[in-house]
C-alpha cells in the first residue's frame, strides 16, 4: 500500500517477495516492523543511527532505531 517507494519501482498494488532475515546491509530495501505496522523502505545506517528511507520525496524518512527488520525485498510482482 502507499506510494512511498515509487522511486524504487514499487507501486501501490505490487506484491513484494521477501527473504525473511533479521539483518540487512545499508542500501537494501527491507520490510521493517515499526509501531506495530510493516513498512517497505530503504535501510540506511549512518553515524550510529538507523533510518528507513522512502523512495518518494513526498514522504519523510523514519527514525528506524526501534524498528525490527523482518526481511529483504528480493523481487516485485506487478499485476496488469
Q: Where are the regions a protein language model picked out?
A:
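Acidic/glycine-rich C-terminal interaction modules and beta/coil loop segments
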Residues: 1-80
Amino acid at each position: 500500500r502507499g506510494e512511498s517507494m515509487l522511486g524504487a519501482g514499487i507501486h501501490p498494488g505490487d506484491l513484494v517477495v521477501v527473504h525473511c532475515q533479521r539483518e540487512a546491509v545499508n542500501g537494501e530495501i527491507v520490510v521493517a516492523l515499526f509501531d506495530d505496522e510493516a513498512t517497505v523502505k530503504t535501510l540506511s545506517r549512518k553515524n550510529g543511527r538507523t533510518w528507513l528511507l522512502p523512495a518518494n520525496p513526498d514522504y519523510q524518512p523514519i527514525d528506524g532505531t526501534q524498528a525490527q527488520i523482518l526481511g529483504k525485498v528480493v523481487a516485485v510482482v506487478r499485476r496488469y
